Amino acid sequence: MRSSSRCYCAPEKDPYDYWLSEYEDGLTMAQCDEFFATLREHIVPLLRKIKAQPQLDDAMLHGHFPEEKQAQLSDYLMRTMGLDLDHVGLATTEHPFTTSLGSHFDERITTHYLEDNFASSMFSVIHEGGHALYDTGSADDLAYTVLDGGVSMGIHESQSRFYENLLGRSRAFTGFVFPKLCELFPELAGHTAEEFYRAINKAEPSLIRTEADEVTYSLHVMVRYELEKRVMHGELKVHDLPAEWDRLYK
């Protein structure tokens, strides 16, 4: 349907170019192809080099971390990030996301809690909190207009991942937050902030994009891009997607 509708909206354009530009103004396949090729050229050798080294120990991230304690951590993180909790709410879902209801005055973020891994929710909240900070930073006179809530999804994701990775996984922030983690989860008291910093920055291939580390995250996006491009050009049928997904991930 997406490919067909392009025939009426912009018949002179490639269907995927049309929808890329609708999603991110001015974005083209040529730009994506060049960008991902450069990224792949550097990420794949880097990942091989990492895998050849002794692996970091992230056992401290796994254990039993009660959901109610993780919820307290979420509240602490949101307040620490400077979110106005009078206008930003938190709920639980399977897949974390952020949305506005009507305007940036009513912002909703979600997370999920895994009782065997508190870091999953911790970084989801920081990530979604980055989205919410960008949304709630919109000018009040733009509320309830199409300009409310940010310039583009590309900028939006840059803000969320800036908070999640450049700040949230930094040595400075992990050192700051570690005493609170030990307060909520006493079993961490036998570890150090430096051990926590190293554990949350462990790089290894995974199947879930939202759980991916900073090195391998972009590989998940590349797979989705290649599949979507082929579907839009009629080179891959939707019912064949699961098998092709499995092949590319292997």
Q: How would you label these PLM feature ranges?
A:
Residues 98-106, 132-139, 194-202:
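Active-site-adjacent bridging/hinge elements
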Residues 10, 111-115, 120-140, 157-164:
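Active-site recognition of the HExxH zinc-binding catalytic motif
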Residues 172-250:
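Long, amphipathic alpha-helical stalk/connector segments used for oligomerization, subunit docking
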Residues 35, 66, 101, 105, ...:
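Secondary-structure capping and boundary motifs in well-ordered enzyme cores
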Residues 1-118:
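Contiguous, non-catalytic segments that form substrate-binding/exosite surfaces or channel walls
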Residues 149-189:
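Post-HExxH zinc-binding segment in Zn-dependent metallohydrolases
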Residues 54-60, 107-115, 139-146, 207-212, ...:
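Glycine- and acidic
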Residues 26, 49-60, 139-146, 167-178, ...:
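Inter-helical turn/loop segments and adjacent helix faces that build the functional surface
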